[in-house]
Amino acid sequence: MQSPRRNAEGRPLGTCDPSSSGSPAHGGGSRFEFQSLLSSRMPGADPTSARLRASESPVHRRGSFPLAGAGSSQALPPQLPEEDRIDLNPSFLGIALRSLLAIDLWLSKKLGVCAGESSSWGSMRPLMKLLEISGHGIPWLLGTLYCLSRSDSWAGREVLMNLLFALLLDLLLVSLIKGLVRRRRPAHNQMDMFFTISVDKYSFPSGHTTRAALVSRFILNHLVLAIPLRVLVVLWAFILGLSRVMLGRHNVTDVAFGFFLGYMQYSIVDYCWLSPRTAPVLFVLWNQP
C-alpha cells in the first residue's frame, strides 16, 4: 500500500494546518491560497486594467451599440450622418419614366419588322428604304435650290426662299438636339443609310420625321392642292415616320418627338417669314426673271 504524498512540512497533500482553518489567505500552503495568489496577479484584477478594458468596450464607443441578445463584444457598425444616406425610395416620376422607356424599347423592337432581310417583313425593306430617301435632306435641299433658280415670279421665289430657310433650320435644330441628347440608335438597326454625317449615329429626334412634318405643313399652307393631293401629303408624312421604326432606325419616342418638333418648326418659319420687305438683300440675288 502506497503512502500518501506529503508536502515539505511532512503533512499529507490536500490537508491544511489546523492553525489556518479560517480564511484561505492565512493558509500556509493550501491549494486555495495558491489559487488566490494566482488570481490576484492576473491582469484583470488590476483596477487600472479593468478601467482600460471598460473604456474600450463597444458600449463606450461613439456611434456603436451592442446587439440585442448578443454579448458585449458584438456591436453595430457606426451610423452614417443624415446627409450621407442614400434615399433608396425612388420617386413616382422616376418610376414612370423608366416604365415609359421600357415600353418604348419593347414596342420599337416589335415594330421593327423591316430591320433586316431576315425579319418578318424583310421583303418590304427596299420599299422602306426608297421611302427613306424621299425624306432625306439632300434631295429636298437640291430640289429647292433648283426650283428657286428656275422660278420666274416673285411669289414663287418668296415661297421657295422660305422653304429653303425651313430646311436649313430643320438641319440645324436636329443636329443640335442629337448632339446634346446622344441617344444611340436601336440595337437591331443596320447602318446602311443614304449619306450620313457624324450626328446621324444618334437617333433622337428622327430627322426624317421632323422634315416630313415641316414640309407637309408648309405645303398644305402655301400650295393650292386638290383634296386627294392634300391627303397624299399627310399620308406621306405619317408613313415616312412609321417607316423609321419599321426599318429599325429609330424608337417610337424619336418619331413622336420628331412630329412635334417639325410641327413647331413651321411655326417659327411662319413667324420669321422672309419677304422682299423683310429681307430685300436675299431677293435681289434672284431678281432676274
From Swiss-Prot:
Subcellular location: Endoplasmic reticulum membrane; Nucleus envelope; Nucleus inner membrane
Disulfide bond entries: none
Spans within the Cytoplasmic topological domain: 1-126, 180-222, 276-289
Renumbered residue ranges of the record's region Phosphatase sequence motif I: 178-186
Region (Phosphatase sequence motif II): 205-208
Site (described: Stabilizes the active site histidine for nucleophilic attack): 254
Region feature Phosphatase sequence motif III, mapped onto this chain: 243-254
Family per similarity comment: Belongs to the PA-phosphatase related phosphoesterase family.
Protein name: Polyisoprenoid diphosphate/phosphate phosphohydrolase PLPP6
Source species of the chain: Bos taurus (Bovine)
Gene: PLPP6
